[in-house]
């Protein structure tokens, strides 16, 4: 497995390749990331992954400086699984050699709701770095996890609207045996918080079942789920039922025509903010 740190080296090694499968990450890899790489290998060759902690997507009170940098450990994990041909691990100067004044701004109705409401500028930072990485790597396919559902939808829409020659492939959320979605931030949970954390997924499962059983009062369903989380010590940002294809709130016609829906939630347990979702 090759490790490169500059865009020039990346392009030199990949010259002539037209079936590249790409998995962008911020490092601190876990089994969920490795599953994305395994799926990428089924859809292209060679598999390239990036490790870059992108400052643009962190807010002023978020954990950019605290975010774990574990490059050597990450390399060892990927080398063990042998799914990845090349790791692109640039530093900040390589990705942003000058102030990034040109940025990608998602539409308000997609980028300023849910995560975008509570993390202003987050998706602008995500889209900007993803566009830059796609320009550097030039993949045929790129794999993203459904755990970051809104991010997946926004990146997919960006690639479609810019007519980028890349297919965005989604991987199902990888979970621990008790249902907790794997996340680099899970390491911040205390023993007691880790025992409580699966409640988020369990509540989404109950919400899903109630919709399948015919309940249609979206606001009441959301409020009840949020209240139940709060009763167990969570600080809830949102529990929201949305249409899958555009993340808008479903109306009566959507239920009648059985439009695919998704339940999404974000809440903080102790000092750790967790997100999850479940398709319906």
Curated annotation (Swiss-Prot):
SUPFAM superfamilies: Nucleotidylyl transferase (SSF52374). It catalyses: (R)-pantoate + beta-alanine + ATP = (R)-pantothenate + AMP + diphosphate + H(+). The keyword Flavoprotein does not apply. The lineage of its organism: Bacteria, Pseudomonadati, Pseudomonadota, Betaproteobacteria, Burkholderiales. Homodimer. The keyword ATP-binding applies. Its EC number is 6.3.2.1. Keywords: ATP-binding, Cytoplasm, Ligase, Nucleotide-binding, Pantothenate biosynthesis. One of its GO terms (cellular component) is cytosol. Pathway: Cofactor biosynthesis; (R)-pantothenate biosynthesis; (R)-pantothenate from (R)-pantoate and beta-alanine: step 1/1. ATP binds at residues 26-33, 145-148, 174, 182-185. The gene is panC. (R)-pantoate binds at residues 57, 151. Belongs to the pantothenate synthetase family. It is found in: Cytoplasm. Catalyzes the condensation of pantoate with beta-alanine in an ATP-dependent reaction via a pantoyl-adenylate intermediate. It comes from Bordetella avium (strain 197N). Beta-alanine binds at residue 57. GO terms for molecular function: ATP binding; pantoate-beta-alanine ligase activity. GO terms for biological process: pantothenate biosynthetic process. Signal peptide: none annotated. It is an enzyme of class 6 (ligase). This is Pantothenate synthetase. The active site is at residue 33. InterPro entries: Cyt_trans-like (IPR004821), Pantoate_ligase (IPR003721), Pantoate_ligase_C (IPR042176), Rossmann-like_a/b/a_fold (IPR014729). The reaction proceeds by a bi uni uni bi ping pong mechanism. Its main location: cytoplasm.
